[in-house]
Amino acid sequence: MTEEVDFLGQDSDGGSEEVVLTPAELIERLEQAWMNEKFAPELLESKPEIVECVMEQLEHMEENLRRAKREDLKVSIHQMEMERIRYVLSSYLRCRLMKIEKFFPHVLEKEKTRPEGEPSSLSPEELAFAREFMANTESYLKNVALKHMPPNLQKVDLFRAVPKPDLDSYVFLRVRERQENILVEPDTDEQRDYVIDLEKGSQHLIRYKTIAPLVASGAVQLI
């Protein structure tokens, strides 16, 4: 993996810009997205560009290995690296699917009310999966239980029935970019007593809701 990768990312205005990454930088971004997704209580922004680029890199690595001599030690090393990358990628995608299944009404409502220009939490494939999952859930509940109930009880509000992500849960994080005047308890009257600075490289245990924007921007990394 030595070739550079053209990566389509988000600029500061919410538009798209082409970023050239080395394969190592691409894998680092995948691992960052994976860790954040594992430890965040909510479904984070979709990263389809990263997923697509990593899959392309895996294909290139497979082609290179097919041309390499089997007895070469480098072949075994590259095979192990490929398996590691595949594990991270599949774990990342599984984690996202589990959150979609767990919070599907809220995920779909968030997508429905998403302001124009704001990054989506769902890739097109994930959106189709979430809609199908909701339709199947509604159909199952209707056929198994609701149709046997009195007419006034044959409806269920899945948005109210399914728990929301707990944004007040606490998460561990490592600071990647120094942040000043972070309000860690925004709901208190004496807010000035709860303002802190986050030094680069420091680690903290903080309420997720407080630092969610910093996770989205990449200023902090969940660990």
Curated annotation (Swiss-Prot):
Inducers of expression: Significantly up-regulated in aggressive melanomas.
Q: List every position bearing Phosphoserine.
A: S12, S16
Important for GINS complex assembly: annotated segments: 166-223
Q: Name one GO cellular component term.
A: GINS complex
Could you tell me which residues carry N-acetylmethionine?
Answer: M1
Q: Which InterPro entries match?
A: GINS_A, GINS_bundle-like_dom_sf, GINS_Sld5, SLD5_C, Sld5_GINS_A
GO biological process terms held by the UniProt record? DNA-templated DNA replication; double-strand break repair via break-induced replication; inner cell mass cell proliferation
Q: Where in the cell is it found?
A: Nucleus; Chromosome; Cytoplasm
Q: Which residues carry this modification: N-acetylthreonine?
A: T2
Stored CDD domains: GINS_A_Sld5, GINS_B_Sld5
Supply the alphabetized keyword list: Acetylation, Chromosome, Cytoplasm, DNA replication, Nucleus, Phosphoprotein
| Principal subcellular localization | nucleus
Family membership noted in the UniProt record: Belongs to the GINS4/SLD5 family.
What does this protein do, in the record's words? Required for correct functioning of the GINS complex, a complex that plays an essential role in the initiation of DNA replication, and progression of DNA replication forks. GINS complex is a core component of CDC45-MCM-GINS (CMG) helicase, the molecular machine that unwinds template DNA during replication, and around which the replisome is built.
Assembly behavior: Component of the GINS complex which is a heterotetramer of GINS1, GINS2, GINS3 and GINS4. Forms a stable subcomplex with GINS1. GINS complex interacts with DNA primase in vitro. Component of the CMG helicase complex, a hexameric ring of related MCM2-7 subunits stabilized by CDC45 and the tetrameric GINS complex.
This one is known as DNA replication complex GINS protein SLD5
Record the organism. Homo sapiens
Q: What gene codes for this chain?
A: GINS4
